[in-house]
Amino acid sequence: MNTSNLDITKKSSVNQRNKERITYLMIKQKIKLLWNKAQMDAFNSNNYIIIKFFKKYTYFLNLILKDNDINSYRTQLKTSFILNSKLTISLLFILIFVGVEASSILFKEIYNQRAASKYFKKLNIQFNNFQYIGYINHLTYKSVPSFLNKEQRIISELFFPKKYGAFSNKKIWDELNCYKINKFNEYITIDPLWLFSNKKKYNLINKKKLNSLSNKTTKIILYESENEEEVNDKNSKENKSLLMDEKSISSSNNIKVKRFDLLIDSEKKDRQLLKVSFQKDDNFSFINNKIFGYYYQQLNNYLNIKKEIILAIEKLIFYSIKKKKVNLWVKNEAPLEYQGQPLKLINNRSLKASYLINKLTDRSNEKIAVTSKQNKFYFKKSPLEAQRFKNKKKFFIASFWQRFRSFLKETPYYFDYTNRIFSKKKFELLSLNKKKISPKDQTQNQEGYSIYLDKSHDIIPFEQINLNNPLGTKGVIYNIKSNNKKYYNLFNYRSRPFVIHAGIKKYLRRKKKNSYFRRRKINNISSNTLLKLKKSYTQNLKMPVFLNPNQWGFYYSKSLKKNIKNRELISPLVNLPIAHQREYLYNSKYLPFVFTNLENYNVYLPNLNKNLQNKVNSDILLKSYTYLPKSVKNKKKYTSVFFNLLKQKIILPDKLINYYQDGNYLKFYFFVSWFLLIELFSILAFMQIFISIFYILRKSIGEIIIELMHEVSGHLNNVTEDLKSWLPEYFFKEPFEWQFFEASTKSFENFAEKENLKRFFDPYILALQYTKSNLRLPFFNIKLDINILQKPIKSYKKFKSIVLSNNEKEELLIKPILLVGPPGTGKTLLVRAIAGEADIPVIQFIVNKDSPGFTRELVPEYEKLSKAFEYAKSIAPCILFFDEMDSLAPKRGGGYFGENAWAEIRLNNNILPYEFSPLKAPEPQKNKMDKFKTKKVKPRGTLLQLLYECNNLSNEKPILLIGATNRQNEIDPAVIRPGRFSTIYNFSLPNSSERIDFCKFYAAGLSMDKEIPWDYIAKRTVGFSPSDISMLMKESSLYGVLNNTKHTLKSLEHGIDRVLGVSKSYLSTLNISKKNVYNKILHMAYYKVGLTLLPLLFKQEMPAFIKLWPMQERAIVKQNKLEENIHSSEWDTLATLEQKLILRYGGKAAELLFSYLDKDLSDEGFSELSAGQLFITFLVDYYNHYSRSEPLGIIPTLLKKRSSTFWHNYEYNLFEFKNIINGPSNVYKEPLIGFYGIEGAESFYDQKDKAKDILDIKDKHAQSLNSYLWWYQYVPKDIFKIWTTSLKNQKWSRFWLPDPELSFFNLDFVNAEIYVSELIDTLLPTWKFNNQGLRKLNKKTRTVWPQIKFATHEYIVSCLILSSLNKAMEVLDEHREFLDFCVAHLIKEEILREPDILKNLKRFNLEKYHPKNNLEKDQFKDNKKLNILNKYTIVSRSGGLNSRRPFPLWIDVDTITKNN
């Protein structure tokens, strides 16, 4: 007998490696697509496929869940991920599905290169594997008949063990275990992992001893040598035999095959793959001289597997395949091009491959052309999904069949119509009741709904379906023969009917013959015969039906109806309920079965005896089946193959049996082929790869996987009671309402100030770690020194020694913690960090009263809370986290307690029996006690349950309760009393320095520009939470990667805009064609610049930036900024508050300086003016800064300061107010006091007359620009076109205005007190007095005190508004050139930043306003130099050396006095 040879491949050439790399990446991408498909099917409600498939591969869970060597992994799952095997079971649903799909791909491609290639050349890749399974069976049975005869029983019992309901069958598994050589010694496969291990440790097969074997079967045993020197010494006589026959193995008791450690030399980058080639003998058949079927003996060692081994296994599997269709990529040695750009420009080969894969799999591109110099081919949609057809007709048939089959997948008629799609026969679908109804008739169901189906209707509306009896709803099927509509009762879909699958005729037809089957009788089989057989056993079938209301029926479009009619296809125009989940006919996960229960099948198996034709239950096993085409050449081969298949019988267990009326068990024949063994090995290989990859990536995507697994478990509640027995009990816990069960991989390293967190939370962490060792909860002394806790204690042993050394042996529970702070401040992240540091799981309980949960039933909230505590105690120690604590334990209302409750309410809430209005009659107010009495009391069950659970915490099962809320005032006081959630940690928004630290903390991974103004960034991020800053830096990193830059100022501003949700849609609203659009832009620019510059000129904190176009901010950021401004104004003085009031009117003052006409003023700044009005209300009413301490409380000090001559006769007697009554005439004659403080001026009337004379003589136009300024030459000239707007018909206003020629005073200026006095005159009625005394007035003319209070209140408010606005205009006009310069910069750049403003202060001689120059330079000069200034009188100040006022105008007083 020939021996096997071990060939070590040499290093391949560069071209060959490139080919292999491309092939590897293409297949890897195909597996990725399959993985996505598996995820969609796994997390879809249609997971019935996975459940059934899970039954079939029960043995597979035996390896994962029942192996003793995997206990460490199970423990790690429990502590770090999720409860025990929940993740593993849910993961198997996906991995097995993907593994089988991928194995079917490899299975096809391997046999394409073998002897079966002559058959495969005539087939299409899309075609079902099982439609040509006979070819594979023929090859395998011919090569290894002895193997199948001997091992058929073991494989069959493996798939369908006797104890079918259990998760494992240890006996059968032991027979397949390679370590039990004495029980299972027919064949031993090779583990591919040892091919990559160290050569010195492992020995391969010895050729000499292989030749000396006397047994026919080839046995390959891996042996681990204890001494490496024995391996090196090839001629050593002590070297044990690696190959033994059956007798020697059974007789030698001392020989033990050890486990193999997966070792690999990480230093070797370019690793050579080993090829093991064997010659074909009577017992083994190796395809393409390479091993493909591998049985992984050491699957439990995947915990130690490395990433390089995973890649090596993939290479071993993938490189043994020669693709047929994908070979188009391998043959093109020339560099590929994508849309005309060669991919060779990318130097890195891995980047090049990933770039190619990403471009080819982009589904957004409908058409992608990939060209090469050697060959040109065209892909429609994605190249990985497309195929190349030489024949256009064949391509059309394939594309049509693919679209039509995808449509039929979503319908319950998938199995019923696949046999008639390409059939020439026209026949109609018959039902159990053959009663026909004319189209004009009207039918009614049980609910009384009328269904009209005439020629104008194509479908049955959803509303007309009887939900109580959906299977009894009438339907319609289109008949091609008679071209009319007929009514039939729908099928009873509780069990699947027998349907003949004749296959697709045009796919496998030969060139000369049109018939697909040899015998024409097959096509003549109608469904009526099958339905009659179905009727006999469906009556007593008690399989429950699970219906999903969201999946009722389907609809045909009219265009599809025409296409089907033209192609002579049956069109089911019905709306049917889906009573069972759909299953794929072409899926390779089902084994091939042959029907033997009907006489019609005798044409397929003519050589079978009739006594072997037992009835089969199709609902359990016959999900996918096929029939083999007959031909003259292969007729004898198939008959012999089928005869060999039907030898062994298997009896199903009681749990999965459906009974006939006579109660006999159903029996069937099970067929085993070489494909089963290959499928088993390939599944194990892919399971090894995927589990290893998930183990490596568990720290980064572990939480996402867990959440997806819980979604899978949530959908499993739709399964029937029969299927629930196959799943663990915790899948169906009621209620399962907590959000997720996890232990986070977060730690204190995720925080910037980790030392402070450790100082506070180390006692909790250490106490929880101590309880994990199943010991008693340690004593925690409150009186510990603070110095001990300042440094984090890393080991709980040290903590134990410190704590237990105290004499006070009092046990103290871990008290609950309440975290309070705004959203995004890291409350939930801190909980995960505590869990990660303590290495314990976390249960997050989220209150949602409207959530039905997984059970689809409304469960009381307090019951969910009780279940959560029970579950937490079962896995203690753990953390039970309550997010949004205010919704779980809201404050109770409905009454107050105590004897003096009403007095306390009245004093605290200022409740009066009546409410006074200043200008209205007294109106009664409702008593608030009535509201308290009528207020409904909310259910308190959840709150009481929480209080009960908090009081019953014990040391035996320690649970750390942590709550989080941003509204502490809404929580019931009983929850936060001492002993419960008494430990409160407040989280606040970061300040400016902390925001800078957060930005630098989250900027790791991408370098930063050195010239970033961090003070500017800190001001722009006012009100940002740490989560907002994290998102900001992520957006900045993405912007930098896409633009190939670092973290720059532009990238950070882009991130800020993304966080705030700023959009540039404002430009689309502007109509450029309008004449006043430029004027509108200028108004907006002046307003924003004035609002920004005025704080700088008052030496206050200015805004960080302004944008030309309006932007929107998130509500939470606005709220945080408003709260910060309110809190900062609580302790300000009156001067500071008045300054803030003036700053509110800076924008409107700058706009008035630009345009004085009322018709040109815009509505810009409404929010600021409203805020100023609110601020004045606080000053006058809340802070009471402008009222005296007299009993009346209405005499403002502002009036006394502004017009002292008016109030000189005032007395404090309340009934002597003659002067007040006659006061308005004296107000007009009071001396005028302006902003310059000029006293002794002329009266108001004289000034008014002179002003009229001046206005009549002078031009009526308002102020105009005298000349262009010096800084005009530094900005584009096009910008100043918007300044050429007409200034005609502008009149003087009553506000203070500067004169173009720098005059000191404008005669038209009207003081604020005089302007408001007119309001007083209109509000106060006229009083008439006699010399004898007062006369009683009527009610209409009677003045009450609230009216006088209102008049004076309005006077104060108006004075503050006008005075603030005039002061803002005066200050901005003094620096008008700098204002215009900033406006020009804003219009040009569309943004004006604080650093840009500060840089230009020196050019305008405004260095004193720089924030760093807090003190003026004049204060440090000598007194002698200061005296010189007294000799001069400054007329006008200097505007800077570059301005049109480079030097100040002054008068030498000494010179004038000397001349006099």
Curated annotation (Swiss-Prot):
InterPro entries: AAA+_ATPase, ATPase_AAA_core, ATPase_AAA_CS, P-loop_NTPase. GO terms for biological process: protein import into chloroplast stroma; proteolysis. Its main location: plastid. Keywords: Membrane, Plastid, Transmembrane, Transmembrane helix. SUPFAM superfamilies: P-loop containing nucleoside triphosphate hydrolases. The keyword Lipid biosynthesis does not apply. Pfam families: AAA. Lacks the zinc protease domain of other FtsH proteins. Also much longer in both the N- and C-termini. This is ATP-dependent zinc metalloprotease FtsH homolog. It comes from Helicosporidium sp. subsp. Simulium jonesii (Green alga). The gene is ftsH.
